[in-house]
Regions:
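N-terminal (or domain-start) structured segment
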Residues: 26-115, 155, 164-165, 178-201, ...
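Residue-level signal for nonpolar/aromatic packing positions in well-ordered secondary structure
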Residues: 34-36, 43, 50, 67, ...
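C-terminal lobe and pocket-closing loops
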Residues: 126, 210-276, 306-309
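A ligand-binding cleft/hinge motif common to bilobed small-molecule-binding domains
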Residues: 98-109, 166, 170-175, 202-234
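N-terminal signal peptide c-region/cleavage motif recognized by signal peptidases
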Residues: 21-23
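N-terminal secretory signal peptides and thylakoid transit peptides that target proteins
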Residues: 2-18
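An extracytoplasmic/periplasmic, membrane-proximal ligand-sensing/linker region
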Residues: 31-33, 175, 215, 262-323
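Hinge/capping helix and adjacent helix->loop/strand transition within the periplasmic-binding protein
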Residues: 84-90, 105-190, 239, 251-284
């Protein structure tokens, strides 16, 4: 009799156990739209690149990718929006030289730590910038511009809208022994409008964003900040031809909040690598004159660390003080 009671209890226990709820498996990532926050305005290299890669991710995942431009404070506003977002892989930051390298040495009491607050999921671009002037500008080359600046100290101006566009002219000024006046802008479009209108004298814009202005003849390049001439514009001399060793190139990448699960981080890295392997993206980047360095996940942090050290030296030589 005792054995029957035990058996009956065991059977009832098994039946009861069958109704214990089993935790549902998490939905496959991504199961809804992904937002890429670009911490600068439309038309810049970050915006252009984010849209190209976002389109490829859409095709790969069958989920929408929304590009959200949040300019201001040299990229800090958009960067902070991602720092405080849910670490679930659905809010991604387009990182730049400004947000993850130069701001560390140029912004006092920076509200985020590029290392502790973010996990980099891809570093994928390196390029120089063109020194641009109006087509009708009197200077036909860099030497002519420098001669004019020496003849009228403090009279020639350059526009800038982030650290990447401010550092090259400041750096050049130090090396050439000239004095230029900087004019700050909120976004690249405003600076370009004023350059075309003759309100400022020159502007340094990375090769991606410069492309449209070169193709339509609105602006003319005097030089490029790569160590050598760009394959896309072999007629444009490198600044290094006048000042040996001059090289200022930047990077782009993507990052998520640091608490994002590692499996999602790995998937995002894979999406980025697949996007950059596509023939369409490669073709477009060749048109922009870009030099690509697709970094695997293990090397991302090291690349950003090296860039941070490099830009700390750039800004030191340029004499740009923290603000």
């Amino acid at each position: 009799m005792q054995n029957k009671k035990i058996n009956r209890r065991a059977v009832l226990g098994l039946i009861g156990g069958a109704f214990v709820p089993i935790p549902a498996r998490a939905a496959a990532y991504p199961s809804r739209p992904i937002k890429i926050i670009v911490p600068f305005g439309p038309g810049g290299s970050g915006d252009i690149t984010a849209r190209l890669i976002g389109k490829q991710i859409e095709q790969r995942t069958r989920q929408s990718v929304v590009i959200d431009n949040r300019p201001g404070a040299n990229g800090i506003i958009g960067t902070m929006a991602v720092k405080t977002a849910e670490p679930d892989g659905y809010t991604v930051l387009l990182i730049t030289t400004s947000t993850h390298a130069a701001n560390v040495s140029l912004v006092r009491n920076l509200a985020y730590d590029p290392v502790k607050d973010f996990t980099v999921v891809g570093v994928f671009r390196s390029s120089g910038s063109y020194m641009l002037v109006r087509p009708q500008a009197e200077w036909r080359d860099l030497a002519g511009f420098i001669a004019a600046a020496r003849a009228a100290p403090g009279k020639l101006t350059f526009g800038y809208f982030n650290v990447s566009s401010r550092t090259p002219p400041e750096y050049l000024s130090r090396l050439a022994g000239i004095e230029l006046q900087g004019v700050p802008y909120r976004a690249i479009g405003n600076a370009v409008t004023d350059l075309i209108g003759g309100e400022i004298h020159c502007l340094f814009i990375d090769t991606t964003a410069s492309n449209q202005y070169l193709q339509n003849g609105q602006l003319r390049p005097l030089a490029i900040t790569r160590l050598t001439r760009a394959p896309a514009t072999p007629e444009v001399p490198a600044v290094a031809e006048t000042f040996p060793g001059f090289e200022l190139t930047g990077f782009l990448g993507m990052a998520v909040p640091s608490a994002t699960p590692r499996d999602i981080v790995a998937q995002l890295n894979g999406f980025i690598r697949e996007a950059l392997a596509s023939a369409d993206v490669r073709r477009r980047m060749d048109e922009f004159g870009l030099s690509w360095d697709v970094t695997d996940l293990a090397a991302c942090d090291e690349v950003v660390r090296a860039e941070r050290e490099r830009w700390t030296e750039y800004t030191r030589v340029a004499g740009i003080q923290p603000e």
